[in-house]
Amino acid sequence: MSVIMTLRVSGDPNKLEQLAGENQDMIRGISQRAKDQGLIAHRFYGSEGQIMVVDEWPDPESFQRFWEAEQANIGPMMEQVATSEPEITFWRKLETGDDVGWAWLRPPPSGSTHR
């Protein structure tokens, strides 16, 4: 079962968007290398004074390998936008029987007509 990884820092979401826009090739390269390490899904979110990354990975170890390998690329960007150390948490999906949405993240089961 895959895990959700959240990474939260205090920082400037607008500055992150600006840096991403100015460094699209670097961002795409990081994303591609993350996919090569097993990344399933990824988003950045921002709130007043906070930045959060929400990823889905096969397991925590896949993320950790990626994170360690990419510090030379991610670190300088984090230094420009973050005002705190990252808080990384791994979450497992709870089976509560009330799932709604997110079906678009994975292809439908073989033979399914669900879109």
Where are these regions (language model features)?
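Short S/T/G/P-rich N-terminal loop/turn motif that feeds into the first structured element of a domain
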Residues: 1-52, 56-72, 80-115
